[in-house]
């Protein structure tokens, strides 16, 4: 980061923000970089997401698991009218940037737990959600996490 005074290292607050931010963007190396927005959850110092076991993202990750991930939240918009119309408009963001390696979770029990955490993040009121009912039944087998 260019501005050292903007670096934020409070791990608890970073974790708190990751649990609130609605989506992130994962970038993968391809002939040209490929970046996709993903729903995610943060648990135990790791980023989790799920996806189909087909398509461009899956193929790229299968061939090269090196990824970067960012999630952001706008803090403040600074309009051009600020300081007597002497500014180019800008924004302040809270953002997290992570580089790492993608890994598929093969253990079905852990995969089910992660899928449950993903649903819980986006539907906290869904206290009756079960991985053994309806559309969720067997879904951990057909997806990568």
Located regions from the model:
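An N-terminal domain-cap segment
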Residues: 1-44, 48
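Charged, gly/pro-rich active-site loop segments
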Residues: 2-5, 76-145
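Short, intrinsically disordered, mixed-charge
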Residues: 19, 62-67, 116-124
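A generic structural signal for short beta-strands and their flanking turns/coil linkers
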Residues: 22, 36, 45, 63-67, ...
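Short glycine- and Lys/Arg-enriched binding-loop motifs that mark or flank ligand-binding interfaces
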Residues: 27, 51, 96
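Short, structured patches in soluble enzyme cores that scaffold and shape functional sites
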Residues: 28-30, 71-73, 102
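Short, well-ordered alpha-helical microsegments
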Residues: 35, 57-58, 129
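A short mixed-secondary-structure module that forms the rim of ligand-binding clefts
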Residues: 41-78
